Regions:
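AMP-forming adenylation/ATP pyrophosphatase catalytic core
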Residues: 1-187
Length: 187
C-alpha cells in the first residue's frame, strides 16, 4: 500500500528535484537537501509544493491510554498525521520549540516505528513507499534540530525513539496536508 504522501509526491510533477539526475540509480537520494526550515511548535510551515506541515502540543490526562490512542490516530489518518512524545522530540510542552524540516540527505537513517530499534536508510524507506526517485528530494523529513535525528518522514513513518508510551505526558501532533487545513476530528 502506498501512502498518501507518496501519492502527493508523484502528483507534484513541478516539485521534482532541481538538478536531479534521471540516470540516478533507484533508491538513491541527492547529496544534499534541497530545502530546510524551522517548524515552530505550535505552528505551521508551507512547503514549496503547496503542502503544509503543522505541529501542536496536546496534554495527556492521567490514566489516559495514550498508546492505543496514538495507534488508532495514525491508522485513521493513514500516515498524514502522527502523535509523538513531545519530550522525546525535544519540544518543551510549556514553551514549545521548533523542529527542523528538510529534504533527505545522503546517508540519512532512522529507526522506523515497528522495527524495534533497527536502523533503515531513508532512501530505502522512500523506495518501499513508492516515492519516485525524482520526487524524493522534496519529501519532508522532520528532525529534532538541524543535525538531530529524524522523528518523522512526513506522511510515511515516524521514528521508534519518539513513539508514545504510557509515560508520555504531552503529545506532539504533526500533520501534513494539501493547501487547506483538514477538518478537525472529534476526540
Amino acid at each position: 500500500a502506498r501512502s498518501a504522501a507518496a501519492g502527493a509526491a508523484r502528483g507534484a510533477g513541478a516539485a521534482s528535484a532541481a538538478g536531479a539526475d534521471d540516470n540516478e540509480p533507484a533508491g538513491t537520494v541527492p547529496a544534499a537537501a534541497t530545502f530546510g526550515e524551522h517548524l515552530a511548535v505550535p505552528g505551521t510551515l508551507e512547503l514549496a509544493d503547496g503542502r503544509v506541515l503543522s505541529a501542536r502540543i496536546l496534554p495527556v490526562e492521567h490514566g489516559f491510554d495514550v498508546v492505543s490512542y496514538a495507534t488508532a490516530h495514525s491508522q485513521e489518518w493513514l500516515g498524514e498525521s502522527v502523535l509523538l512524545d513531545a519530550q522525546a522530540c525535544g519540544v518543551d510542552p510549556v514553551h514549545g520549540g521548533s523542529l527542523w524540516v528538510s529534504g533527505p540527505e545522503a546517508g540519512d537513517t532512522m529507526q522506523p516505528l515497528g522495527m524495534h530499534g533497527q536502523s533503515k536508510k531513508i532512501s530505502d524507506l522512500l523506495g518501499e513507499a513508492g516515492v519516485p526517485v525524482e520526487s524524493r528530494s522534496m519529501m519532508p523529513i522532520v528532525r529534532t534540530n538541524i543535525r538531530g535525528h529524524v522523528v518523522w518522514v512526513a506522511g510515511i513513518r515516524p521514528d521508534e525513539r519518539v513513539k508514545c508510551t504510557q509515560d508520555t505526558k504531552q503529545l506532539l501532533e504533526l500533520n501534513i496536508y494539501s493547501g487547506h487545513k483538514p477538518f478537525e476530528r472529534s476526540q
